[in-house]
Amino acid sequence: SFTLFYYKFMQNNERNDEHFWSHNQGTPLYYNWCGLAFERVCLTHINQIKSALGINGIICNAYSWKSITSTDKTNKGSQIDLVIERDDNVIDLCEIKYTKEKFTIDSTYNDIIQNKKVRFIQEHKTSKAIHLILISANSVCMNEYSEEFQKIIYSDSLFETETLRI
């Protein structure tokens, strides 16, 4: 993880600014790092995500997915942060979102998500049920577009521990 962080964000510190990271807080570089770091946290907390979805007892295969990139501008490639393919014939397509403030899903973002879903179905040729899941670092503004998601999971769910029931 540190090596990835270094080559992506610190290698360009040409002036050897010892406060490089502090000086870059609030910049696009900083928020890009926050988004990638939040994705990595989510990918290491699959069991907690399954718990939040209520699918603890279901065998699942979890992975990230990227479509075949097209050179056709009308048929853009897509990427899904986390796919949870379940043994109960459901596939959860998880969008992992880091924002500093409350996240609002607008029509443009909704179109992007729907395109990802369509591309995934086309390329996998699946007849399984597809659920859209949003995993958000912060709160989400509830509106007509947020209702497209089967479930919204917040970052605090990633750090809950299961209690053993006897």
Listing of model-derived features with the role each one plays in the protein:
Residues S1-I80:
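Accessory nucleic acid-recognition modules appended to NTPase machines
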Residues N12-N16, G54-I58, K73-K76, V90-E95, ...:
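Extended hydrophobic-aromatic, low-complexity segments
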Residues T44, G54, N115-H124:
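Acidic, metal/cofactor-coordinating or nucleic-acid-engaging core segments within structured domains
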Residues I46, I80-K100, I113-Q114, L132:
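Conserved catalytic cores of phosphodiester-cleaving nucleases, focusing on short active-site segments
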Residues T99-R119:
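Mg2+/Mn2+-dependent nuclease catalytic core
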Residues T126-I166:
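Domain-level recognition of nuclease-like catalytic cores that cleave nucleotide substrates
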